[in-house]
């Protein structure tokens, strides 16, 4: 598979709204595979397709449990609050404190076109919200209560 260069701010593609995937085909599966490889190579926990220059509604997430691939993901419900630090592969060197829902109900398709409906809490909920925000052209720095430069 291929490892893509992650697009960073101020690239306009990060501010656009991603388009729904209409058909799951070999090209979509290849993009998911490349997103996975890119996320792991960058030592990230999540990646959205716009971050590699593809304005489609696809994300990959792995917080150390299992790889989760979602096509056309949606957050159906949010509960509670959690305030925590976030960073982003597309906003290198910046960390911010962001208030997110503690629990989310998410719907999307897996790579086989099967619909997934599941609840996520804590870190997984935070990462899913962060990645789905990317599909709307929203970056964590837009929601951050405060930000700081992190020395690399």
Curated annotation (Swiss-Prot):
NCBIfam families: pept_deformyl, PRK00150.1-3
The enzyme's E.C. designation: 3.5.1.88
The reaction(s) this protein catalyses: N-terminal N-formyl-L-methionyl-[peptide] + H2O = N-terminal L-methionyl-[peptide] + formate
Gene3D superfamilies linked: Peptide deformylase
Superkingdom as given in the UniProt entry: Bacteria
SUPFAM superfamilies in alphabetical order: Peptide deformylase
The name this protein goes by in its record: Peptide deformylase
Cofactor, free-text remark: Binds 1 Fe(2+) ion.
Residues that bind Fe cation: 88, 130, 134
InterPro entries xref list: Peptide_deformylase (IPR023635), Peptide_deformylase_sf (IPR036821)
Function (record text): Removes the formyl group from the N-terminal Met of newly synthesized proteins. Requires at least a dipeptide for an efficient rate of reaction. N-terminal L-methionine is a prerequisite for activity but the enzyme has broad specificity at other positions.
Keywords: Hydrolase, Iron, Metal-binding, Protein biosynthesis
Name of the gene: def
A GO molecular-function descriptor: metal ion binding
Family classification: Belongs to the polypeptide deformylase family.
Cofactor dependence: Fe(2+)
């Amino acid at each position: 598979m291929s490892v893509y260069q992650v697009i960073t701010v101020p690239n306009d593609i990060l501010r656009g709204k991603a388009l729904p995937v209409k058909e799951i085909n070999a090209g979509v599966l290849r993009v998911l595979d490349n997103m996975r490889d890119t996320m792991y190579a960058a030592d990230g926990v999540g990646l959205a397709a716009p971050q590699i220059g593809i304005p489609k509604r696809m994300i990959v997430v792995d917080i150390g449990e299992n790889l989760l691939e979602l096509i056309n993901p949606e957050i159906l419900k949010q509960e509670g609050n959690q305030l925590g630090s976030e960073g982003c592969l597309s906003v290198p060197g910046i960390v911010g404190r962001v208030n997110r829902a503690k629990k989310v109900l998410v719907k999307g398709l897996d790579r086989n076109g099967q619909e997934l409906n599941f609840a996520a809490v804590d870190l997984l909920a935070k990462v899913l919200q962060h990645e789905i925000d990317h599909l709307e052209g929203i970056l964590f720095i837009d929601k951050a209560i405060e930000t700081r430069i992190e020395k690399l």
